[in-house]
């Protein structure tokens, strides 16, 4: 749900409900792109019984983080940690058991054109922001990814 986009919310909600049904029918995790809609998206996937969901590039309300985590869902950090103070604060609030790392490529972050290799940069910036070691973040996010994606 991207409430910054020009597509009507009603249309987005209908399509989102169809995607939720598809994910549930095939027992697949959902990757959620949310802008100005985190609480609504969370409520919709939770109400529909979605088992696994990732709130990609989490930049939603910090006070929503505990609810998302309590639902068993994940929130991901991305290379925006190099410049976005709000993303840094949000990622600090995410419990380690709910954190994933990503690159969101091919996106350009200021002057950095994101590539898969930049997951290491995301790891480093997440560790720095959270005051945890690279090893702690890497071990936890790897375990989280395995749980979320069944790998």
What are the residue ranges of the model-derived segments?
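Short amphipathic alpha-helices and their capping/turn segments at secondary-structure boundaries
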Residues: 86-96
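Active-site glycine- and acidic-residue-rich loops that bind
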Residues: 74-87
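Short acidic/histidine-rich active-site segments
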Residues: 97-113
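Mid-to-C-terminal alpha-helical segments outside catalytic/metal-binding sites
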Residues: 21-22, 119-151
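Active-site micro-motifs of SAM-dependent methyltransferase domains
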Residues: 75, 107, 147
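Divalent metal-binding pocket/active-site signature
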Residues: 1-71, 89, 108-116, 132-135, ...
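Active-site gating loops and adjacent loop-to-helix segments of metal-dependent hydrolytic enzymes
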Residues: 4, 97, 106, 118-123
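Short secondary-structure boundary segments
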Residues: 57, 79-81, 103-105
């Amino acid at each position: 749900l991207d409430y910054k986009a020009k597509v009507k919310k009603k249309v987005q909600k209908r399509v989102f409900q169809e995607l939720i049904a598809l994910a549930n029918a095939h027992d697949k995790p959902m990757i959620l792109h949310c802008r100005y809609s985190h609480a609504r998206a969370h409520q919709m996937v939770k109400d529909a019984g979605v088992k696994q969901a990732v709130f990609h590039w989490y930049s939603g309300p910090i006070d929503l983080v505990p609810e998302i985590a309590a639902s068993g869902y994940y929130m991901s950090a991305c290379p925006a940690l190099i410049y976005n103070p709000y993303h840094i604060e949000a990622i600090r609030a995410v419990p380690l058991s709910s954190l994933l790392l990503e690159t969101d490529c091919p996106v350009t972050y200021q002057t950095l054109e994101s590539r898969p290799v930049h997951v290491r940069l995301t790891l480093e910036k997440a560790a720095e922001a959270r005051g945890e070691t690279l090893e702690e973040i890497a071990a936890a996010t790897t375990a989280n990814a395995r749980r979320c994606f069944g790998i």
